[in-house]
C-alpha cells in the first residue's frame, strides 16, 4: 500500500483464488466493489512464487510541483503548489546528485528502522512542462518518505538554502536535519514498476 495522500498510476497486487471467474473478467468483477478512486485495469495469471513486493526489481516515483503565482484548483491534492519561480536546471543538478549507490539515512523519516539504509538510485531528474515540474526517481528500493525528502532537498537547492554540490556531503553525514523538509504527500505518484515477468512492465 502507499502512504495516505499518495497516488498510484501503476500498482500491482497478487492474490490466490479458487474463483471460477475467468481471469480476464476479474477486473470487471472487482471494480464493482472498489471505491470510485480505485480501478483494477488488468488481471494476469503469474507463477505461484510471485510476490508483488518481493519480486519487484525497481520502482519509479514522480513528484509533481505546480509552479505558478496562482493556484490551479484542478491540482489540489494532486501537485504541490509552489508560487515562487523555480529554476528547473538547478533542481535537476541537485536531483542528479542523488544518483548512484548511497546510504540514504539523511533523507528518510527519523525513527524508522530498516535492515539497511543503502539504496541504488538509477536516475533522479527534474523536468518542466509549462507550470508543472516533475521530479522522477527510480531506485531498487525506497526508505520511508525518501522521495518526499529528496524533493524537499532539491527545493532547498532551488531556494539557495544549499547547493547541488552540498548533497554528497549531506548524504555522507546521515544527518536528517541537514537535508530539506519532507514535502506534502499529494504531489507524489508511483508511476512505474519493473519485474522479471515482462508482461507486468507494459
Task: Go through each PLM region and give its residues.
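Structured-RNA-binding interfaces characteristic of tRNA pseudouridine synthases
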Residues: 1-202
